[in-house]
């Protein structure tokens, strides 16, 4: 923000400084209840309070930039390992802001890092968020029913188009304050590449991207604004492709001369189904046939099946993998084929998040609060909820006052995964959930794309950027936060657990994934790229009236403004 802007907002700054100065110190957690409770009030450092107040105003002044980044990445709609338009756009933006750019890191062509340092360069804060989309999730934003932009095309059905806006705007604001006030530190921005394939972050760790990092602040879209600490409740995951080799023959003329690799693949899948009954209820496992042969009249000489193995932790997940290898060998024996290769395509440890960093961030969540949704936002949310036969309670309006802690092992019942776990077991890490999506949706679905280039996404990302900026300032100016984070990391989190990567030295990023899908749809997707020089919003470019819902869920007009916190 230009210095003259501060003069016009002096009264707001004064009020914000008073608010921060009166705030309690970071909350202390009670391990026995897994809920953080307030500690006795302690005023913030006046300098930190002033900087935080300024940061809130500066982030708010960049609401337009948040909207443009969110909408631009939504319009690219790229799948994992093919995020090249996103790379070009983001790195160009950050280079103009003075960040040093490195592309193709960790052997991943679509990956990148952006770094900026001042003074001693310490502490180093890494800021990450995923960028990849979901196959067949194309849908027009702001439309509360199925209406693809590109039929069969990919889309942001996980909402990964919004998190980079949170990090970029927060980083630009904090960088300006660091320069002006001569605050030492390093900002390292990076994307979560191919998160849906769980195939990016472990390779970033192996490449040493975070070797100098003090704290990682990760962001992920949600329908609330919050953070948690301890065991995340996510599953560990190992992604592996089993490739079989046999010999071809005429499927009708001389089938007895062939050894069908496809038969082996099908037997492996069936064998896993029989074994599934005798596995823990908490495990999750799924597979698809990636290569089933070329045509029916040729006995397939090669075929492959791609598995996701999920369990509570590294040992249990590896045990599933070992079972899978035994079943593969059995399938090969039954079909007189061979297990040609077993490639680990990706992986993710079950995440464990830093309590001290979460405590600092939670206090900032309370300060920022949820966005002010208007009637149009709520109408869209209730419209898609009703469309999917979910409870139509609309958007959440309150943040959780309690800081939730570690999930107890006996209550763990399995679920999804996120490869942020590999980073979290190497450096103190938290994930900020920011409210750019709608509650009650299925996830990994076209419905989850509907809000992601609308005022809901813009307001949610702006709130996230405010929390992120405030937490970065806590880390920069309160050495105890970093010291406590590493004390927790060494003496609690990793006291009895040693990180061992799932990926082996011979495993490389499977950057070929999704190339064929993107090649198929690229020319159609390009027609929908956002042009912010011609249109204020992506909705305007698409000619979509916000919100568009089925008539029975439309509500009377009310306040259609607001959105500022």
Language-model regions, residue ranges each:
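Acidic/His- and Gly-rich active-site-bordering loop/insert found
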Residues: 33, 37-156, 165-186
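Metal-dependent amide/peptide-bond hydrolase catalytic core
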Residues: 262, 266-565
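Boundary at the C-terminal end of the N-terminal hydrophobic targeting segment
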Residues: 24-31
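N-terminal secretory signal peptides that target proteins for export/translocation
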Residues: 1-9
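Sec/Tat-exported extracytoplasmic proteins
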Residues: 55-66, 70, 74-77, 98, ...
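Bacterial N-terminal signal peptides
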Residues: 11-23
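Divalent metal-coordination and catalytic microenvironments
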Residues: 73, 94, 114, 127, ...
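Histidine/acidic-residue-rich, glycine-tolerant segments that coordinate divalent metal ions
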Residues: 146-155, 161-162, 178-300, 310, ...
């Amino acid at each position: 923000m230009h210095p003259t802007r501060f003069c016009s907002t002096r009264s707001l700054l004064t009020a914000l400084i008073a608010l921060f100065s009166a705030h309690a110190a970071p909350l202390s957690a009670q391990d026995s209840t897994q809920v953080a409770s307030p500690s006795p009030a302690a005023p913030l450092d006046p300098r930190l309070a002033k900087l935080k107040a300024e940061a809130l105003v500066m982030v708010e002044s960049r609401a337009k930039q948040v909207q443009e980044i969110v909408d631009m990445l939504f319009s690219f709609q790229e799948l994992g390992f093919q995020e090249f338009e996103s790379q070009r756009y983001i790195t160009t933006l950050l280079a103009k802001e003075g960040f040093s750019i490195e592309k193709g890191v960790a052997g991943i062509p679509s990956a990148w890092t952006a770094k900026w340092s001042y003074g001693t360069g310490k502490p180093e804060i890494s800021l990450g968020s995923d960028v990849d989309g979901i196959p067949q999730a194309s849908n027009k934003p702001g439309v509360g029913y199925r209406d693809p932009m590109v039929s069969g095309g990919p889309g942001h059905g996980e909402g990964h188009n919004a998190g980079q806006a949170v990090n970029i705007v927060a980083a630009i604001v904090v960088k300006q304050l660091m320069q002006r006030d001569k605050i030492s530190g390093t900002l390292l921005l990076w994307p979560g590449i191919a998160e849906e394939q769980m195939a990016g972050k472990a390779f970033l760790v192996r490449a040493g991207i975070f070797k100098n990092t003090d704290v990682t602040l990760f962001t992920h879209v949600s329908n609330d604004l919050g953070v948690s600490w301890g065991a995340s409740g996510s599953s560990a995951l190992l992604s592996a492709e089993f490739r079989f080799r046999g010999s071809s023959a005429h499927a009708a003329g001389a089938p007895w001369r062939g050894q069908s690799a496809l038969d082996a693949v099908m037997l492996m899948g069936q064998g896993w189904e029989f074994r599934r009954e005798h596995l823990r209820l908490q495990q999750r496992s799924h597979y698809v046939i990636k290569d089933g042969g070329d045509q029916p009249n040729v006995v397939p000489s090669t075929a492959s099946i791609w598995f996701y193995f999920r369990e509570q932790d590294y040992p249990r997940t590896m045990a599933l993998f070992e079972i899978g290898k035994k079943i593969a060998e059995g399938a090969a024996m039954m079909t007189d084929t061979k297990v040609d290769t077993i490639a680990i395509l990706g992986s993710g440890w079950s995440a464990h998040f830093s309590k001290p960093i979460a405590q600092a961030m939670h206090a900032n969540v309370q300060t920022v609060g949820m966005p002010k949704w208007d009637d149009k936002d709520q109408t869209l949310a209730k419209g898609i909820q009703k469309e999917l036969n979910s409870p139509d309670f609309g958007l959440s309006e309150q943040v959780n006052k309690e800081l939730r802690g570690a999930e107890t092992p006996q209550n763990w019942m399995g679920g999804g995964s996120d490869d942020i776990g590999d980073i979290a077991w190497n450096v103190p890490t938290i994930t900020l959930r920011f409210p750019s999506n709608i509650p009650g949706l299925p996830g990994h679905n076209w419905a989850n794309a509907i809000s992601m280039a609308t005022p809901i996404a813009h307001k949610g990302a702006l709130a996230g950027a405010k929390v992120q900026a405030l937490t970065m300032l806590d880390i920069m100016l309160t050495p105890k936060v970093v010291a406590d984070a590493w004390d927790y990391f060494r003496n609690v989190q990793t006291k009895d657990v040693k990180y061992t990567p799932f990926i082996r030295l011979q495993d490389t990023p499977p950057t070929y994934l999704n190339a064929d899908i993107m090649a198929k749809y690229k020319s159609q997707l390009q027609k929908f790229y956002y042009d912010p020089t011609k249109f204020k919003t992506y909705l305007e470019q698409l000619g979509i009236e916000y919100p568009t819902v089925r008539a029975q869920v439309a509500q009377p007009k009310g306040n259609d403004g607001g959105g500022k916190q």
